[in-house]
Design a protein with these regions (language model features):
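Aromatic/hydrophobic pocket-lining residues that form the small-molecule binding cavity
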Residues: 56, 117, 147, 186-187, ...
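Conserved, mostly hydrophobic/aromatic
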Residues: 32, 40, 56, 104, ...
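Conserved strand-turn element in the central/C-terminal portion of the radical SAM core barrel
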Residues: 141, 165-175, 192-217, 236-242, ...
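Catalytic cores of alpha/beta
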Residues: 146-152, 210-227
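Hydrophobic faces of well-ordered beta-strands that scaffold small-molecule active sites
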Residues: 24-26, 102, 134-136, 162-164, ...
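Canonical Radical SAM [4Fe-4S] cluster-binding loop centered on the CxxxCxxC motif
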Residues: 15-77
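Auxiliary Fe-S-binding modules of radical SAM enzymes
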Residues: 1-20, 226, 232, 240-374
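Conserved SAM/AdoMet-binding glycine-rich loop
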Residues: 65-196
């Protein structure tokens, strides 16, 4: 285990799920304990270490101090460091958001020693008893190693939602991408977490298997969801940056990069094959084309499929206009195609940048890469 750095003030990790935008962020460990996935570059240069429980509790104390200042329960002092300012900023944001949820950063909060994590959870609840939800990223293999009773204890202490990177249910792609887990292990982890009373949020990454494995990935991933029935299914379209290890597969011709239209087709096949579950589906990530693709299964399934079909049935020029509008952040949903101001703005950009059907795919790919910190 790498040497744990000394406490140097309040820490923030690099990322969080979009759904945790209003949560207090507390860093439980630095980097990713696995850090071998060929499709991910978030933590490549971050040495992994698990923070001491005492250091996390110091972060909690600092946030509590600034919360009390903001709520006029404590006389203010001058912030002393950049870390102090980060704690103040986080406390202010959290107070404005209602102080109901907490997200543990970085890659897998369950890697902390179970007794120490329990200690942190107890302290967090004592300090902020109004908290309703505590969440963390969690790997399926880690969930499977933990006793069910330990997971139930976490749930009692309000650690009641896991964000799980399923990515795909296809074993071949999982092995190719060095995910370190099998389809069956992902099913078992999801069922186990839910048996403990913990909500699970499964991430699906369409496009990961290229054109070659898109169909099988959609079907196998749907099969996992059908067996687990997760509380949330969140779609995260694949973005292919040159600094990712998986980029080599595309250079060698092992995989072929799908374009937006093909990725949406994969998503449609996935949704079409979800049966007998009651999950909430959400397409809330900046990399997704159809942000309005969301709803409760099974009642909203036909509406979501109809939305996809509406896009796929658009003329190619209109599809390309919307794709560029989304990638530039000018358009947010398909209804924006009826907004003449936004349509004209995208058309002007296409004319000025000489974007047409011969280069739209390459342009959109570059814009996707710019949208994420990898």
């Amino acid at each position: 285990m790498p040497k744990i750095p000394p406490y140097n003030g309040f820490e923030l990790g690099p990322i969080r799920p979009p759904s945790e935008a209003y949560s207090l962020l507390l860093r439980i460990n630095r980097g990713c304990g696995w850090n071998k996935c060929r499709f991910c570059g978030f933590y490549r240069d971050v040495p992994f270490s698990i923070r001491r429980a005492e250091d996390v509790k110091k972060d909690i104390d600092l946030v509590k101090y600034w919360v009390d200042v903001i709520q006029n329960r404590q006389p203010p002092r001058q912030a002393k460091s950049e870390a102090d300012y980060e704690a103040l900023s986080m406390a202010y944001h959290w107070v404005q958001s209602g102080m109901r949820s907490v997200f543990f950063q970085d890659g897998n909060g369950l890697l902390m020693n179970p007794d120490e994590l329990t200690d942190v959870l107890e302290y967090l609840n004592q300090t902020f008893p109004q908290i309703q939800r505590i969440t963390t990223y969690a790997r399926s293999d880690t969930i499977n190693r933990l006793p069910l009773e330990r997971l139930k204890r976490y749930r009692e202490l309000k650690l009641n939602r896991f964000h799980i990177g399923l990515e795909t249910g296809n074993d071949h792609i999982l092995k190719m991408m060095r995910k370190g887990v099998t389809k069956q292990a992902q099913i078992e982890a999801g069922i186990k977490a839910m048996a403990a009373g913990i909500e699970i949020n499964e991430f699906y990454m369409p496009g990961m298997g290229g054109r070659e494995y898109a169909r099988q990935s959609a079907l196998d991933t749907a099969d996992v969801m059908n067996q687990v029935n997760p509380d949330f299914i969140r779609i995260r379209s694949m973005a292919l940056a040159e600094n990712l290890e998986m980029y080599e597969d595309y250079e060698k011709g092992i995989l072929t990069r799908p374009i937006d239209i093909e990725t949406i087709g994969e998503i449609r096949l996935f949704l079409e094959n979800l049966h007998g579950i009651t999950s909430w589906v959400d397409s809330d990530h900046i990399l997704n084309i159809l942000l309005e693709l969301k709803g409760r299964l099974p009642e909203d399934k036909d509406r979501m499929l109809a939305l996809i079909d509406f896009f796929l049935d658009l003329p190619e020029d209109t599809q390309n206009l919307f794709r560029l509008g989304r990638r530039l952040g000018i358009m947010g949903q398909l209804s924006d195609l009826h907004n003449e101001v936004l349509v004209d703005k995208v058309k002007q950009t296409m004319d000025q940048a000489h974007v047409d059907k011969t280069n739209i795919d390459a342009v959109c790919d570059r814009l996707m890469i710019r949208a994420i910190p990898i």
